[in-house]
A protein has these predicted regions:
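N-terminal leader/signal peptides at the extreme start of proteins
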Residues: 1-16
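Conserved hydrophobic/amphipathic alpha-helical signal-anchor segments
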Residues: 10, 35-84
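N-terminal single-pass transmembrane signal-anchor helix
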Residues: 12-39
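Domain-level signal for compact, non-enzymatic binding modules
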Residues: 16-17, 56, 109
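Conserved coupling/switch loop of ABC ATPases
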Residues: 17-26, 47, 74, 93
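Amphipathic alpha-helical protein-protein interaction surfaces
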Residues: 27, 51, 87-88
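Low-complexity, acidic interaction segments enriched in glycine
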Residues: 60-140
Length: 140
């Protein structure tokens, strides 16, 4: 039998079938989706860690304010007292916002730190008092 006229050899020489191409595209799509989900989860975790770290750093600035002013700023004064204290130099140039663009919340005495104060972020949902709030208290 002549190799040029063999239908099996001609089919193999033409390349992949439509079904094979669809399977490869589907597999690429599944891998891309899995990687995308993993990246988004890491992004959210990074934002939560950033918010927690910022809350702790703001808390350290509040402690410094206490040393300079013989007491914590009132809840009414809020965190703006760190940038505009009643006496002395500002402790912070400006108070940062959380990773989601919201202001940090300052409460004295705190709900979590009852003998001190709470500095907290509303978290990714932007709702105060929900489960995703993070602040200057130990993780539960």
């Amino acid at each position: 039998m002549n190799k040029k006229n063999n239908p099996m050899i001609k089919a193999a020489a033409r390349g992949m079938s439509l079904l094979e191409i669809m399977v490869v595209i589907t597999l690429i799509g599944l891998v891309t989706a899995a990687v995308g989900v993993a990246v988004m989860n890491q992004l959210e975790k990074g934002q939560m860690d950033t918010a927690r770290n910022q809350a702790y750093e703001i808390g350290k600035s509040v402690e410094l304010y206490k040393l300079q002013n013989a007491g914590y700023p009132s809840t009414a004064q809020g965190l703006n007292a760190l940038a505009n204290p009643p006496k002395g130099k500002p402790i912070m140039e400006r108070v940062p916002q959380d990773p989601w663009g919201n202001d940090y919340i300052y409460v004295v005495p705190g709900a979590k730190n009852t003998n001190k104060f709470d500095v907290r972020s509303k978290g990714p949902d932007g709702v105060e008092g929900s489960e995703d709030d993070v602040g200057n208290w130990p993780e539960e």
